[in-house]
């Protein structure tokens, strides 16, 4: 009789979120991208040691790169190398998605930022979004709308 295989599950699936991006930008369209990582980075992601604040996506030579994201190294996982926490990481997107994103980012007012990093099976995926910046009055209107939705739910719940 065959031995039962133990499936290792990751807690939650979400590694990191960029809540600041949802506050500062209007999200036009979302994309899912793979990331090219080193071994010590994957071990650090399993421990949940990633920060997406102040990170963004840049395009060079027809390729997309994640710039400014921090993956803090584990002391036990990176003993033989000197890890760089904020290195630029290549994003894996299809040609059609790359062309669509590059065309939109070249327009005035659009940029591309990461929203979340999560596990999809044994792979690390990054949710990136095509965004447009918010003005201060837009942020206030969004906050007022969120408060009204919360109050409305509280009233109807009674």
Swiss-Prot record:
GO CC entries: cytosol
Record-linked PROSITE patterns: SSRP
Its source organism is: Acinetobacter baumannii (strain ATCC 17978 / DSM 105126 / CIP 53.77 / LMG 1025 / NCDC KC755 / 5377)
Pfam families per UniProt: SmpB
What is the residue range of the signal peptide feature? none
Principal localization reads: cytoplasm
> Function of this protein?
Required for rescue of stalled ribosomes mediated by trans-translation. Binds to transfer-messenger RNA (tmRNA), required for stable association of tmRNA with ribosomes. tmRNA and SmpB together mimic tRNA shape, replacing the anticodon stem-loop with SmpB. tmRNA is encoded by the ssrA gene; the 2 termini fold to resemble tRNA(Ala) and it encodes a 'tag peptide', a short internal open reading frame. During trans-translation Ala-aminoacylated tmRNA acts like a tRNA, entering the A-site of stalled ribosomes, displacing the stalled mRNA.
Q: Which keywords does the record carry?
A: Cytoplasm, RNA-binding
Q: PANTHER family annotated for this entry?
A: SSRA-BINDING PROTEIN (PTHR30308:SF2), TMRNA-BINDING COMPONENT OF TRANS-TRANSLATION TAGGING COMPLEX (PTHR30308)
> Which Gene Ontology molecular-function terms are recorded?
RNA binding
What InterPro entries does UniProt report for this protein, alphabetically? SmpB, SsrA-bd_prot, SsrA-bd_prot_CS
What is this protein called in UniProt?
SsrA-binding protein
Entries under HAMAP family matching the protein = SmpB
**Family named by the database record:** Belongs to the SmpB family.
């Amino acid at each position: 009789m065959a031995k039962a295989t133990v499936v290792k599950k990751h807690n939650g699936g979400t590694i990191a979120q960029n809540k600041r991006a949802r506050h500062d930008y209007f999200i036009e369209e979302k994309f899912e991208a793979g990331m090219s990582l080193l071994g010590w980075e994957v071990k650090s992601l399993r421990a949940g040691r990633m920060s997406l604040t102040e990170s963004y996506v840049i395009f060079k030579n027809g390729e997309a790169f994640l710039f400014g994201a921090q993956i803090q190294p584990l002391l036990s996982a990176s003993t033989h190398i000197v890890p760089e926490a904020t290195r630029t990481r290549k994003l894996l997107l299809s040609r059609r998605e790359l062309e669509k994103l590059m065309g939109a980012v070249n327009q005035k007012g659009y940029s591309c930022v990461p929203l979340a990093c999560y596990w999809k099976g044994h792979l690390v995926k990054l949710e990136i979004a095509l965004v447009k910046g918010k003005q201060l009055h837009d942020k206030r209107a969004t906050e007022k709308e969120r408060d009204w939705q919360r109050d409305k739910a509280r009233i109807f719940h009674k």
